[in-house]
Regions:
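Core catalytic alpha/beta fold that binds nucleotide/phospho-ligands
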Residues: 1-293
């Protein structure tokens, strides 16, 4: 289920019905916040207060679709929203877009969403978010579809993965700790793909990671409001975690080493989402061997 201020729901397209989501392109007034939430942004500039209020409004609408009663949504570990018990969720915002997605914790282990302007990353940032094989794949993909900002897509995919990882309880994850590949129009670019010149990816923060400037938020939909390239494209991506996963939970569920997600480019925006269904059980809890008689 999804709701939106107007037009087709973008988040629902990348979540594929696995979560309740809500999104807005016009900012709300902070008057809709609970007092506890207002205190979190009491010293923020007006634009940040409106951005915060709209994202919280989206979260409440998505939670209402799950049957949750309205309540303050405060900050938890690492500044991410502290979702109600029994709920997994994620929030995202960029210029001209605010969104939230939630799912029952008994059906989804982890969830991450990210929205970005569909525009190239600032100069010098790609080297901090992608390593050699990924950059080689980006060059191949750019030759095939130059209308897609593949560098921004890589950044966004890893952002979604980090939100899912962090929400699950994982330790710090750097950009260099995850490797991304993509699927578009039936053509995959993955770790085994042949690349010319080769023998045969609150957010992710790699060590020494430079900040990625974001365009000033302003209301209104459409490509002009986001300052990015227009057009429509969609596909899937895969991200392989290169560090040990969080410990297996007592109920036997474990965070997978490989995550699969969806991406969408539309109206000057780029969106990505990752969900880890609770059916994912890559490894059971080891049991102690029985003592011999």
């Amino acid at each position: 289920m999804s709701v939106r201020g107007g037009g087709a729901p973008l988040l629902d397209a990348v979540l594929a019905g696995r979560a309740c989501c809500a999104e807005e392109t016009v900012d709300a007034e902070p008057a809709g916040l609970f007092p506890e939430e207002e205190a979190l942004v009491a010293r923020a500039v007006p634009g940040r207060r409106r951005e915060f209020a709209t994202a919280r409004l989206c979260a409440r609408r998505a939670l209402a679709a799950l049957g949750a009663a309205p309540a303050p949504l405060l900050r938890g570990r690492r500044g991410a929203p502290a979702w109600p018990a029994g709920v997994i969720g994620s929030i995202t915002h960029c210029a001209g877009f605010r969104g939230a997605a939630v799912a029952p914790a008994d059906r989804v282990l982890a969830l991450g969403i990210d929205a970005e302007p569909h525009a190239p990353l600032p100069r010098g940032v790609l080297g901090a978010v992608a390593f050699g094989p990924e950059r080689a794949r980006l060059r191949v993909l750019a030759a095939r579809r130059s209308d897609i900002c593949w560098d921004r897509l890589l950044f966004s995919a890893k952002e979604s993965v980090y939100k899912a990882w962090s929400g699950y309880g994982g330790a710090w994850l750097g950009f260099e700790d995850a490797e991304a590949s993509w699927l578009l129009d039936g053509t995959a670019e993955g770790p085994r793909a042949r690349v010319p010149g080769q023998g045969e990816e609150h957010r992710l923060g790699g060590r020494g990671r430079p900040p990625v400037p974001r365009a000033p938020a302003r209301a209104g939909g459409g490509a002009g409001a986001h300052g990015g390239r227009s057009g429509v494209a969609a596909g899937r991506f895969r991200v392989r975690i290169l560090v040990p996963p969080p410990p297996v939970r007592p109920d036997g569920f474990a965070f997978p080493q490989v995550l699969h997600g969806r991406w969408l480019v539309r109206d000057g925006l780029l969106l990505t989402a990752v969900t880890v269904p609770r059916t994912a059980l890559p490894r059971p809890i080891p049991t102690a061997p029985k003592e011999p008689f």
